[in-house]
């Protein structure tokens, strides 16, 4: 079976990972960093905003079940793609809304989806999502992997991540994988 990979960032990678992990067709997802100028950045370094890396997720998915275009369409509904360098209380370039295509085909698809979403006026403001070429994806430290599932009672998880997961389940029920535990959010 052939798999495709996408690298996207929409604020805190814990949030994006938690929602997209529930998406039918996703085989694996890894939080990490990309788009900056420092090799092998750490979470602490990225949080300073000086590395210019974004918190991103690397999503490996089955294109026979989930197309890259549909993944991007869903991605643009699970975070606020209209506010530059911010998601809620999380502020800084590391929280920018970004699509990092790995090929010309992905870049063209990303441009098409952004134009489609703008034209549909789904959001009240213009999109601030950028398209940046994927140079290197740096996996995040192990403590960031599947953070929401491992810390569901943490204050940030309850206040920020759980509502996003519940909203995704409600508004995109036809895209939620069948074997997700209802206790996850």
UniProtKB/Swiss-Prot annotation:
Substrates-to-products reaction catalysed: L-methionyl-[protein] + [thioredoxin]-disulfide + H2O = L-methionyl-(S)-S-oxide-[protein] + [thioredoxin]-dithiol; [thioredoxin]-disulfide + L-methionine + H2O = L-methionine (S)-S-oxide + [thioredoxin]-dithiol
GO biological process: protein modification process
Active-site positions on this chain: 12
Enzyme Commission number(s) from the entry: 1.8.4.11
Coiled-coil spans in chain: none
Cited Pfam families: PMSR (PF01625)
Keywords, alphabetical: Oxidoreductase
Record bears the keyword ATP-binding: no
Function: Has an important function as a repair enzyme for proteins that have been inactivated by oxidation. Catalyzes the reversible oxidation-reduction of methionine sulfoxide in proteins to methionine.
Similarity comment text for this entry: Belongs to the MsrA Met sulfoxide reductase family.
Descriptive protein name: Peptide methionine sulfoxide reductase MsrA
Lineage of producing organism: Bacteria, Pseudomonadati, Pseudomonadota, Alphaproteobacteria, Acetobacterales
């Amino acid at each position: 079976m052939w798999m495709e990979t996408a690298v996207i960032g929409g604020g805190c990678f814990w949030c994006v990972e938690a929602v997209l992990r529930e998406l039918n067709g996703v085989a694996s997802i890894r939080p990490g960093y990309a788009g900056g100028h420092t090799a092998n950045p750490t979470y602490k370094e990225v949080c300073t905003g000086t590395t210019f890396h974004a918190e991103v997720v690397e999503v490996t998915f089955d294109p026979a079940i989930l197309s890259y275009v549909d993944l991007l369409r869903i991605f643009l509904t699970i975070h606020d793609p209209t506010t530059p360098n911010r998601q809620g209380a999380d502020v800084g370039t590391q929280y920018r809304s970004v699509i990092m295509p790995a090929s010309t085909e992905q870049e063209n698809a990303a441009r098409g989806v952004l134009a489609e979403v703008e034209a549909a006026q789904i959001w009240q403001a213009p999109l601030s999502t950028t398209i940046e070429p994927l140079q290197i994806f740096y996996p995040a430290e192990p403590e960031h992997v599947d953070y929401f599932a491992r810390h569901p009672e943490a204050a940030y998880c309850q206040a920020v991540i759980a509502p996003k997961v519940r909203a995704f389940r409600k508004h995109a029920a036809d895209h939620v994988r069948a074997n997700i535990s209802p206790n996850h959010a």
